[in-house]
């Protein structure tokens, strides 16, 4: 995303690191874990920064991707992103459990979801883009479903099988939503209505500024 927006190397690194650890930072703030894990152990930030540099360098040498290379790149990014979503979701739940909130199911699910999608939301905000989880294919819902699957299975089996079940649910739901174009319903507002709404917002802003 940062490269497509023509960010320089520093910008690409910041966006890459934000995407990787932003959700975990938000989670730790919510559950009161200080200092946040990303700063206690900077391995994740270092790895994200290194990967960002390598991707930047590869594209700088290769130039624009086209045809099969672009398709392969997009597929690889989708698979890595989906795997990361599942792993971060489980990581978020277990981090919340270790903080002493195991009896708060909602907070556990929230911690899993915010860890999984929070970094992506911050990334989209930084690049002046609508957060993908609000307009794109099912993403946060896949994370929430995977989190619920983990908690359900964890009550009946050991930790690792619960993790695998959660990963499988998140991974499958996310990929199927992309393959079949599943989306949550949206309200389709006609162009004339959009113009009226935009004009009303502009008038309201002008009145406030007067």
Features from the language model and the residues they span:
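Hydrophobic alpha-helical segments of small multi-pass membrane proteins
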Residues: 51, 109-114
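Alpha-helical transmembrane segments and their membrane-interface boundaries
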Residues: 1-106, 132, 136-210
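Residue-level hotspots within the lipid-embedded alpha helices of multi-pass solute transporters
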Residues: 82-83, 112-113, 117
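Membrane-helix boundary/interface segments in integral membrane proteins
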Residues: 117-129
């Amino acid at each position: 995303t940062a490269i497509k927006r023509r960010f320089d190397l520093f910008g690409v690194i910041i966006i890459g690191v934000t995407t990787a650890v932003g959700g975990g930072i938000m989670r730790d703030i919510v559950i009161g874990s200080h200092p946040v894990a990303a700063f206690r152990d900077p391995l994740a930030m270092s790895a994200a920064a290194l990967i960002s540099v390598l991707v930047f360098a590869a594209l700088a040498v290769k130039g624009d991707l086209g045809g099969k290379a672009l398709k392969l790149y997009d597929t690889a990014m989708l698979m890595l992103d989906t795997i990361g979503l599942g792993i971060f979701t489980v990581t978020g739940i277990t981090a919340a459990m270790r903080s002493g909130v195991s009896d708060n199911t909602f907070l556990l699910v929230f911690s899993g979801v915010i860890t999984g999608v929070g970094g992506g939301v911050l990334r989209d905000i930084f690049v002046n883009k609508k957060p993908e989880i609000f307009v794109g294919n099912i993403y946060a819902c896949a994370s929430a479903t995977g989190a619920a699957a983990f908690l359900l299975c964890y009550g009946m089996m050991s930790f690792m099988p619960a993790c695998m079940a959660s990963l499988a649910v998140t991974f499958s739901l996310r990929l199927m939503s992309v393959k079949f174009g599943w989306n949550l319903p949206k309200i389709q507002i006609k162009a004339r209505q959009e113009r009226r709404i935009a004009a009303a917002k502009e008038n309201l802003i002008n009145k406030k500024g007067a």
